[in-house]
C-alpha cells in the first residue's frame, strides 16, 4: 500500500513491523468475500470476519507480538458496519504510518451478476434501505471506489462460481505449492458399523478369512504372515490395482471442485485381518500419488 497518512489519521501506538502476513479482504457485497475467507482458511490462514476497521491496529499489534501463533492473518471487512466503515481509508493510512505491513484484496463483480446473486439468496443488500437491490449496489460501489483504487489486488468474480473463486484464491495465496488433497484411508469391521464420514466404502470379505486359520487368528493384517495369506488369494492384488486406479481420476475431479479432504473406508468382518492388510497396501500406493497426503487408520483393530 502507498496511501499517504492524512492529517487527521487515528493515532496508533507504534509497533514493530510484523513477521506475520496481514491480508485485508474487502470489496462488493455478493462478490465472494465469504468464499475467499473459507479458501484462505483451507490454506492455513487465521481469518477474522466482519472486523470494525478501527480494530485493525489492535489486531495487527497482536499479530506482531505473536507471529508464531498468527503467521498468516486475514481480516474480512465490509460495509455492514456502515458508519464504522467510513474511517477505513484513514485507518489503513494510520496502519501504514505506524509500520504495519499489509496488503488489500478487493473483490468485485458486475452489477448484473451481483443483482442475480442477491435475488438467488433472497436477501436485501446492506445499503439498499427502502430502495432496489441495484440502488444498494451502486451506493456501495461509490463508497468503495477509493479503496478499490488503492488495493494491491482486484479480483473480478463476475464469471466465477464458488469453485472457481476458491481456486483463484488458492493460486494467489498458497505459499506451499499446489493445494494438497488430504486422504484418510481407514480399515474397519462391518460388525461395528460403516464409518459415517466415509466417501468411499470397499468390502473385502470376498477374501478368505484368516480368522479361521489357528496360527493367524491372534495376528493382524499388519503382520507379514497375514498379509501374505491375504495377497495369495486370487483377486486380492487385482482388487487393489483397480481400486487405486478408480480413485485417481476421482481425486483429480476433487481438486477441480476444490474438495480438499476424503475418507476411504475398507471393511471386513471384524476389521482385524483382511481389511487391515488391504488398507495398508492401498495407503502405500496412494501415498505415492502427487499432491496427496495419507492418514492411515485402523479403526477396529484390537477391538475384539
From Swiss-Prot:
* Superkingdom in the source lineage: Bacteria
The UniProt entry, under SUPFAM superfamilies, shows: P-loop containing nucleoside triphosphate hydrolases (SSF52540)
Binding of GTP, residues: 78-81
Output the InterPro entries linked to this UniProt entry: P-loop_NTPase (IPR027417), RapZ-like (IPR005337), RapZ-like_N (IPR053930), RapZ_C (IPR053931)
Q: Which GO terms describe its molecular function?
A: ATP binding; GTP binding
**UniProt keyword annotation of Nucleotide-binding present:** yes
- Cited Pfam families: PapZ_C (PF22740), RapZ-like_N (PF03668)
Keyword annotations: ATP-binding, GTP-binding, Nucleotide-binding
Q: Does the keyword Transferase apply?
A: no
Q: Which family does it belong to?
A: Belongs to the RapZ-like family.
Give a short account of what the protein does. Answer: Displays ATPase and GTPase activities.
NCBIfam families reported for this sequence: PRK05416.1
What is the official name of this protein in its record? Nucleotide-binding protein KRH_12070
From which source organism is this entry?
A: Kocuria rhizophila (strain ATCC 9341 / DSM 348 / NBRC 103217 / DC2201)
Amino acid at each position: 500500500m502507498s496511501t499517504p497518512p492524512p492529517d487527521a489519521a487515528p493515532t496508533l501506538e507504534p509497533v514493530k513491523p510484523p513477521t506475520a502476513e496481514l491480508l485485508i479482504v474487502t470489496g462488493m457485497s455478493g462478490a465472494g468475500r465469504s468464499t475467499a475467507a473459507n479458501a484462505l482458511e483451507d490454506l492455513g490462514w487465521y481469518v477474522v470476519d466482519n472486523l470494525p476497521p478501527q480494530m485493525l491496529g489492535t489486531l495487527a499489534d497482536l499479530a506482531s507480538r505473536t507471529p508464531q501463533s498468527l503467521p498468516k492473518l486475514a481480516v474480512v471487512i465490509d460495509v455492514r458496519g456502515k458508519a464504522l466503515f467510513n474511517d477505513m481509508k484513514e485507518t489503513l493510512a494510520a496502519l501504514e504510518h505506524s509500520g504495519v505491513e499489509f496488503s488489500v484484496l478487493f473483490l468485485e463483480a458486475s452489477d448484473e451478476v451481483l443483482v442475480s446473486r442477491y435475488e438467488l439468496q433472497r436477501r436485501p443488500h446492506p445499503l439498499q434501505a427502502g430502495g432496489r437491490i441495484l440502488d444498494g449496489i451502486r451506493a456501495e460501489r461509490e463508497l468503495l471506489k477509493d479503496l478499490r483504487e488503492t488495493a494491491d489486488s482486484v479480483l473480478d468474480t463476475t464469471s466465477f462460481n464458488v469453485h472457481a473463486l476458491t481456486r483463484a484464491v488458492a493460486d494467489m495465496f498458497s505459499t506451499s505449492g499446489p493445494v494438497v488433497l488430504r486422504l484418510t484411508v481407514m480399515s474397519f469391521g462391518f460388525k461395528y458399523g460403516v464409518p459415517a464420514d466415509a466417501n468411499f466404502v470397499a468390502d473385502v470379505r470376498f477374501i478368505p478369512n484368516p480368522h479361521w486359520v489357528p496360527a493367524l487368528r491372534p495376528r493382524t493384517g499388519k503382520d507379514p504372515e497375514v498379509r501374505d495369506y491375504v495377497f495369495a488369494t486370487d483377486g486380492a492384488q487385482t482388487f487393489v490395482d483397480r481400486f487405486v486406479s478408480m480413485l485417481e481420476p476421482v481425486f483429480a475431479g476433487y481438486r477441480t471442485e476444490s474438495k480438499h479432504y476424503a475418507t476411504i473406508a475398507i471393511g471386513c468382518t471384524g476389521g482385524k485381518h483382511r481389511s487391515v492388510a488391504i488398507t495398508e497396501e492401498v495407503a502405500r500406493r496412494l501415498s505415492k500419488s502427487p499432491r496427496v497426503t495419507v492418514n492411515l487408520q485402523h479403526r477396529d483393530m484390537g477391538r475384539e
